[in-house]
């Protein structure tokens, strides 16, 4: 009974050997999960035969439990794939194999827009099509919106064949613009576990999740080294937070007309204890993927609130310091209550710490609308960051109470181009018509600053005036 309570021993076959002839003992042991019961006197050949029989039954049961099919797609499940892939590679050790991981991008959004039935149709379509075009492949549904394929490597043109498969799947999809990302691990190392082989294909796939130009990525040693570095950064996160290795830097925002500082944006930098700096481009996307960004967002928010409290206590001039809020933080439970409490504990006006939401994070939905309304009701001012990079800008401006929009650098870069000038002129006019201020970010040239001044842009942020500075320098 105690053995069955132990998760390590729960699946181990148990044969009870006893000198008791009482049948109730035998019945009780079998009820508790014993695989067999051997009374005295022991016959060596009988005991050995029964042990072998129990082992074979256990192995057969394990194989049967692994051979399970996904109800929706009819494909193998993840556990079944692990089992059969291992058997196949052991059966043909001289064959070269590739593992392909396929991920349906924005699958939750597809379900929300088209409905769950269409989402299910897409999954069934992918299952059927992959089986059709990869006839020698072992295919499984790996997770809700991911598929895994083990296929033998052709001697030539594997990458070309892979491109043809991807094109066929895309062109025959049940909805237009279906986006599937593929991670491929070629010539798999058979000395490592099936799960690790799949992990390498997943690494490749994740490396292009934000790259809209590329749908196929291949695992290589460089990607493996990058994964090791990312794991080390994740492992270092707790100590870095505890030891305050994360520093808040500031990039000033300048009043276009007076050319004086009118505010700043808080940015994060990571200075390790040995003095080396970790690039934000390395750790921020990583922490956004694994969810650690929510704690980093709160860390920055607390630091800025403390700085604003110190400035106000010392009688220094007031100006707002905006804080970026990630998509993950926006959906984090208790966000409004927590951030409101931090502001009140520092006894500062909410106007001191406006919140910047990227255009993609603020993409309109009922949930986002409710959350934004709660932030505004608490007293926060909201800025739309990266305006012009997404497709929901006008909808968001119409229904969400933003006070400021920040023109993305990609728009500013087109200043001097006739159509680019027209777009910026009309966006500024639109924002002012909605009683919103406009901040242009990424301004690097005198000509850009002069144009924005003529267009009555409110504030400028960029290297033309100042790069991000540490707090002491700022």
Predicted regions located by residue number:
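A short glycine-enriched loop-to-beta-strand structural element that forms part of the catalytic core
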Residues: 98, 144-146, 150, 174-208, ...
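Active-site core of bacterial EAL-family cyclic-dinucleotide phosphodiesterase domains
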Residues: 84, 229-286, 324, 384, ...
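GGDEF/GGEEF active-site signature
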Residues: 125-189, 196
């Amino acid at each position: 009974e105690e053995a069955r309570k132990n998760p390590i021993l729960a699946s181990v076959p148990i044969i009870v050997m006893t000198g008791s002839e009482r049948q109730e003992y035998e019945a009780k042991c079998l009820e508790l999960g014993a695989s067999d019961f051997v009374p005295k006197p022991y016959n060596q050949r009988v005991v050995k035969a029964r042990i072998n029989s129990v082992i074979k039954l256990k192995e057969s049961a394990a194989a049967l439990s692994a051979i399970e099919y996904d109800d929706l797609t009819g494909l193998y499940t993840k556990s079944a794939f692990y089992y059969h892939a291992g058997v196949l590679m052991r059966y043909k050790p001289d064959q070269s194999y590739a593992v392909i991981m396929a991920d349906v991008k924005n699958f939750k959004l597809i379900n929300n827009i088209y409905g769950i039935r269409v989402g299910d149709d897409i999954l069934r379509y992918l299952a059927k099509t992959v089986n059709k075009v990869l006839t020698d492949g072992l295919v499984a549904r790996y997770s809700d919106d991911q598929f895994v394929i083990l296929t033998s490597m052709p001697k030539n043109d594997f990458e070309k064949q892979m491109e043809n498969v991807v094109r066929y799947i895309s062109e025959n999809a049940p909805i237009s613009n279906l986006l599937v990302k593929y991670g491929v691990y070629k010539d798999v190392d058979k000395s490592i576990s099936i799960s690790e082989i799949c992990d390498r294909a997943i690494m490749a796939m994740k490396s292009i999740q934000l790259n809209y130009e590329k749908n196929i990525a291949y695992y290589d040693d460089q990607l493996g080294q990058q994964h090791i570095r990312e794991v080390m950064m994740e492992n270092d996160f707790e100590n870095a937070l505890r030891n305050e290795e994360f520093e808040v830097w500031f990039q000033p925002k300048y009043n276009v007309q007076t050319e004086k500082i009118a505010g700043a944006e808080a940015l994060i930098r990571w200075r390790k204890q040995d003095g080396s700096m970790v690039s934000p481009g390395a750790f921020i996307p990583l922490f956004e993927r694994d969810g650690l960004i929510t704690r980093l967002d709160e860390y920055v928010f607390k630091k800025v609130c403390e700085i604003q409290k110190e400035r106000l206590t010392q009688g220094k001039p007031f100006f707002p310091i905006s804080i970026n809020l990630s998509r993950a933080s926006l959906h984090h439970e208790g966000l409004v209550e927590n951030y409101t409490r931090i502001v009140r504990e520092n006894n500062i006006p909410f106007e001191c710490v406006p919140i910047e939401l990227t255009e993609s994070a603020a993409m309109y939905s009922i949930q986002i609308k409710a959350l934004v309304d709660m932030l505004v009701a608490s007293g926060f001012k909201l800025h739309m960051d990266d305006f012009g990079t997404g497709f929901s800008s006008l909808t968001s401006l119409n229904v969400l109470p933003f006070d400021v929009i920040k023109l993305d650098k990609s728009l500013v870069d087109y200043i001097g181009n006739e159509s680019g000038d027209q777009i910026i002129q009309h966006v500024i006019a639109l924002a002012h018509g909605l009683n919103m201020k406009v901040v242009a970010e990424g301004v690097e040239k005198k000509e850009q600053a002069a144009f924005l001044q003529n267009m009555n842009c409110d504030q400028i942020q960029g290297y033309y005036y100042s790069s991000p500075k540490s707090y002491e320098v700022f």
